[in-house]
């Protein structure tokens, strides 16, 4: 439930379902207050419909801290609704009326602490074992459901009529385990609860510690340190050794059980399930041990109440017949008897008030109205007897089955009319009838004393309540700060993750954009290569066509010139017949035409070879250029990815530094807050201790003042006592004198009687004078002795109190010093753990970066290797195809960039890598420059002239043909391919084996 909701608000459906909407005043009748504490009051009542007896715990949630009270009520109701076990109090429902919650539960006879108060002695070991066994079963059930009681003690362990043990008072319980709140009753608190805010969380083993203290309480009537101030007890528990059983009469099983429950370190302490297997609770014992104990306690309660009743009746009768003087005497006697019966509890003084803050209804003080003034002795006696019945029954009780149908008015309405001679038997029967309406194990004096203690010790109880409230508030502040810092840390981490994700998305988009750009560039380049190849072919074909036309024109001119020369030669030779001349001329023409035809055919063949060779060269060069472009694009992509990964790693390192700085700042903030809260807590503890010291000194001074004021009355009483003794002595002496006189008168003659009487008179006077002197001396000695004794006693009490308060103050200082040292050690440990955690995170981050860099390097190497292998396969396939077509790799690579640029103006853009070799780090080796286009080829035909020249031209052409033959090309290509393959293999292998990051810039 949120703390901001209004107290008593039922708008939340989950909260509204916890409470019944009926009017509790109509459902329950005969409400009688039987106890109250800081939470409110406890009543027993009857269910109007079933006449069942129930206990109603009224808790107000108005006034100061109403929200906190309301949350405590809601928490307790939720807790009670969740539990259902034979060893836990039965929950019947909760109602709301006028800002008060009515928590309805079953009745029980009383608590284990009531047994100690009634019998005034410890319980037997088998009785302690039976009570402990039942409590352990209830605790095991709670702990199995991750619930913690946090206030186990004898006052919260209730007993029913059949001897069933039940756990009660879940106002301090925790629904979650582990917990870290400062709750419970000081003397029963486990060390880890006291140090909850300083050292961390605790679990159900705190109930095991409290159970061990409860065992000591049942064995020694009081828990350890009960004679100490509650705050001092807290400091003592937190830093000193665990308590043990003092007496040697207990068995080893019991001692070992208590020692195991009171292990200082929670990890060494057994769980409730493990304790159920302990021999102490498993030892055989009578099944009726608790029933017998309850019956003995009920009988003792009845006798004690009857004794009180008879004393009060006697006082009233004596007051009526003997007057005030006798009343005073009887009061003194009764006080002496009362001190003898209840002095053990009263000697605790104000130190006993703390446990009553959170105890259950069975062990809480009851509120009984004071007796009204009576007009006569009879009415006063009737009122006392009637009210006494209520007081003696003011406890958490269980109705006997055979007594369910009792009258509506259980109190007696008639009394004997004559108080001087009452029928004693009938009066006792009336008293027993009132008592037997409800069974109880609590005496009226216990209820009255708890009322007085609750009223007297409100200041100390409020101090402890304020201290608990402060500790809870500090815990809430620390938790609020931790939640705030955790939210800030989560927000910061989310922002960093978002920034990293944004950067990765941007990098992914940039990389995708780059890949698309590269794809478009490659597609564009492929189209450009296809167009350039087409233009290149057209250019060569145009040049060859022009060359062919020029060649044909040249042949025509040469043919005409040759024809004219032949005609001139024939004209010069007149001796040759004309027919023979015509035949020789025709033959020469035919030979020349045949030669020209061969020359034309050779030219066409060479042009065709040249075209095929140059196209093949162009394709190979374009393939190498495309490979270089692919390498450049892959290089750019890998460099881009490397840059992005470096930027991502730099951001991760920056984010790590930012998170580290924030974590250290948060830890410093928490530790600073913790130090401030510890300082404030220590100041409050010191202030409380000083106030407690002043209050104890003030109470002692008040006591001494009362003793001094009452000293004259005491001295008067002593003087009267001495005077009475003197009077008795005088009477004795007078009787002795008379007896002696009579004896002497009988034994002496009458003539001597006068002298004897005179002598006896003088002797009597002398002895009375001596007795008077002794009386004065006794009075003076008594006065001086009493005054001196009072001063010495008061001085001794002052010294004892000062020593006790000084010890408690030193204990507080030691406790606070220990807390400071533990806090400093905890802070150093937290800083060291944070440094280790940050260092480990940094190491993991660096390892992750290194792994990513290695993965990126492997990916880079694999990309390069696969690219080079693919390009090598493409070159090898191209060269194999070239060899099949009859082209040598060396010839294909023998084209100069000058000839290439001169013959094809548009080809200058492709000559940026003249050698066609690799880039700065990797690529394809390429042969020498290609031959120029459009120039006469080496070994080509000479211009037409003499036939010898023709023969030479043919021979040189044949040599050219041999050199460019498929066999030569194949041999050259195979050699070049082998060298190229070796170079490529060596380059890739060296790059992969080195494993180093290759630079592309």
From Swiss-Prot:
PANTHER family: SERINE/THREONINE-PROTEIN KINASE TAO1-LIKE PROTEIN, SERINE_THREONINE-PROTEIN KINASE TAO1. Serine/threonine-protein kinase involved in various processes such as p38/mapk14 stress-activated MAPK cascade, DNA damage response and regulation of cytoskeleton stability. Acts as an activator of the p38/MAPK14 stress-activated MAPK cascade by mediating phosphorylation and subsequent activation of upstream MAP kinase kinases. In response to DNA damage, involved in the G2/M transition DNA damage checkpoint by activating the p38/MAPK14 stress-activated MAPK cascade. Residues 949-967, 974-1001 have a biased composition (Polar residues). Pfam families: Pkinase. Its main location: cytoplasm. One of its GO terms (cellular component) is cytoplasm. Residues 324-431, 567-586, 911-1001 are annotated as: Disordered. This is Serine/threonine-protein kinase TAO1-A. It comes from Xenopus laevis. Transmembrane segments: none annotated. Residues 375-388, 577-586 have a biased composition (Basic and acidic residues). Keywords: ATP-binding, Cell cycle, Cell division, Coiled coil, Cytoplasm, DNA damage, DNA repair, Kinase, Nucleotide-binding, Serine/threonine-protein kinase, Transferase. Its EC number is 2.7.11.1. Belongs to the protein kinase superfamily. STE Ser/Thr protein kinase family. STE20 subfamily.
């Amino acid at each position: 439930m949120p703390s901001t909701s209004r107290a008593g608000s039922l708008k939340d459906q989950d909260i509204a379902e916890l409470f019944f909407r009926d009017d509790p005043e109509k459902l329950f009748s005969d409400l009688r207050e039987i106890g109250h504490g800081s939470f409110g009051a406890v009543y027993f009542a009857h269910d109007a419909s079933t006449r069942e007896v129930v206990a109603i715990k009224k808790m107000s949630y108005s006034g100061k801290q109403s929200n906190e009270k309301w949350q405590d009520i809601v928490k307790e109701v939720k807790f009670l609704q969740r539990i259902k076990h034979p060893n836990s109090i039965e929950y019947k429902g909760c109602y709301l009326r006028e800002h008060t919650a009515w928590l309805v539960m079953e009745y029980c006879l009383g608590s284990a602490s009531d047994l100690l108060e009634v019998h005034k002695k410890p319980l037997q070991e088998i009785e302690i074992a039976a009570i402990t066994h039942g409590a352990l079963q209830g605790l095991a059930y709670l702990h199995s459901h991750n619930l913690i009681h946090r206030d186990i003690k004898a006052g919260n362990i209730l007993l029913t009529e059949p001897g069933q043990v039940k756990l009660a008072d879940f106002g301090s319980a925790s629904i979650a385990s582990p917990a870290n709140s400062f709750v419970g009753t000081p003397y029963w608190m486990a060390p880890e609860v006291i140090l909850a805010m300083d050292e961390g969380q605790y679990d159900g083993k705190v109930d095991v510690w409290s159970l061990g203290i409860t065992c000591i309480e049942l064995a020694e009537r009081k828990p350890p340190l009960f004679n100490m101030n509650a705050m001092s007890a807290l400091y003592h528990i937190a830093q000193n050794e665990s308590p043990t059983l003092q007496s040697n009469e207990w068995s080893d099983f019991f001692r070992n059980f208590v020692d195991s429950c009171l292990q200082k370190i929670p990890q060494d302490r057994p769980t409730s399930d493990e304790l159920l297997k302990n021999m102490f609770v498993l030892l055989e014992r009578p099944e009726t041990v608790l029933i017998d104990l309850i019956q003995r306690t009920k009988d003792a309660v009845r006798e004690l109440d009857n004794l009180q009743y008879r004393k009060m009746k006697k006082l009233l009768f004596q007051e009526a017949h003997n007057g005030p003087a006798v009343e005073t005497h009887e009061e003194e006697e009764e006080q002496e008897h009362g001190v003898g019966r209840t002095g053990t509890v009263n000697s605790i003084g104000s130190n006993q008030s703390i446990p009553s803050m959170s105890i259950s209804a069975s062990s809480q003080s009851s509120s009984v109205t004071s007796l009204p003034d009576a007009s006569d002795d009879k009415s006063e006696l009737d009122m006392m007897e009637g009210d006494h019945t209520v007081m003696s029954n003011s406890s958490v009780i269980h109705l006997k089955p055979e007594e369910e149908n009792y009258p509506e008015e259980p109190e007696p309405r008639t009394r004997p009319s004559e108080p001087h001679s009452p029928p004693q038997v009938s009066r006792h029967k009336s008293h027993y009838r009132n008592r037997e309406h409800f069974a109880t194990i609590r005496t009226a004096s216990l209820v009255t004393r708890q009322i007085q203690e609750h009223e007297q010790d409100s200041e100390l109880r409020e101090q402890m309540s304020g201290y608990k409230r402060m500790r809870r508030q500090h815990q809430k502040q620390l938790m609020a700060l931790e939640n705030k810092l955790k939210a800030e840390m989560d927000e910061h981490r989310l922002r960093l993750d978002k920034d990293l994700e944004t950067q990765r998305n941007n990098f992914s988009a940039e990389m995708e954009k780059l890949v698309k750009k590269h794809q478009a560039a490659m597609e564009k380049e492929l189209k450009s290569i296809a167009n350039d190849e087409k233009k290149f072919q057209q250019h060569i074909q145009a040049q060859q066509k022009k060359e062919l036309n020029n060649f044909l024109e040249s042949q025509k001119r040469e043919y005409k010139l040759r024809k004219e020369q032949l005609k001139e030669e024939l004209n010069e030779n007149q001796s040759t017949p004309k027919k023979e001349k015509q035949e020789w001329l025709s033959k020469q023409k035919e030979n020349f035409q045949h030669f020209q035809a061969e020359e034309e055919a050779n030219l066409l063949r060479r042009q065709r070879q040249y075209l095929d060779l140059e196209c093949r060269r162009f394709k190979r060069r374009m393939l190498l250029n495309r490979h270089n472009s692919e390498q450049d694009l892959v290089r750019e992509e890998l460099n881009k990815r490397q840059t992005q990964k470096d930027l991502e790693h730099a951001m991760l390192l920056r984010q790590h530094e930012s998170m580290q700085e924030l974590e250290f700042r948060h830890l410093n903030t928490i530790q600073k807050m913790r130090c401030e809260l510890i300082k404030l807590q220590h100041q409050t503890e010191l202030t409380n201790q000083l106030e407690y010291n002043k209050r104890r000194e003030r109470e002692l001074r008040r006591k001494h003042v009362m003793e001094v004021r009452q000293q004259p009355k005491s001295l008067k009483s002593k003087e009267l006592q001495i005077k009475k003794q003197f009077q008795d002595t005088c009477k004795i002496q007078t009787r002795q004198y008379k007896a002696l006189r009579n004896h002497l008168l009988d034994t002496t003659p009458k003539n001597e009687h006068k002298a004897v009487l005179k002598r006896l008179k003088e002797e009597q006077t002398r002895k009375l004078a001596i007795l008077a002197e002794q009386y004065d001396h006794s009075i003076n000695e008594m006065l001086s002795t009493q005054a001196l004794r009072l001063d010495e006693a008061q001085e001794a009490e002052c010294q004892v109190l000062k020593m006790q308060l000084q010890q408690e103050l030193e204990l507080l200082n030691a406790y606070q010093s220990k807390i400071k040292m533990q806090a400093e050690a905890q802070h150093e440990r937290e800083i060291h753990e944070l440094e280790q955690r940050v260092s480990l995170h940094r190491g993991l981050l660096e390892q992750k970066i290194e792994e990513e860099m290695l993965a990126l390097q492997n990916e880079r190497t694999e990309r390069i290797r696969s690219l080079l292998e693919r390009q090598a396969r493409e070159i090898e396939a191209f060269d194999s195809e070239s060899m099949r077509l009859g082209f040598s790799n060396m010839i294909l690579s023998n084209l100069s960039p000058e000839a290439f640029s001169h013959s094809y103006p548009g080809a200058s853009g492709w000559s940026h890598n003249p050698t066609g070799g690799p880039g700065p780090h990797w690529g394809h080796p390429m042969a020498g420059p290609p031959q120029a286009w459009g120039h006469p080829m080496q070994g080509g035909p000479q211009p037409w002239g003499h036939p010898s020249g023709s023969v030479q031209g043919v021979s040189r052409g044949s040599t050219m043909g041999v050199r460019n033959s498929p066999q030569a090309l194949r041999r050259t290509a195979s050699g070049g391919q082998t060298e190229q393959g070796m170079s490529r293999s060596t380059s890739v292998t060296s790059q992969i084996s080195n494993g180093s990051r290759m630079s592309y810039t």
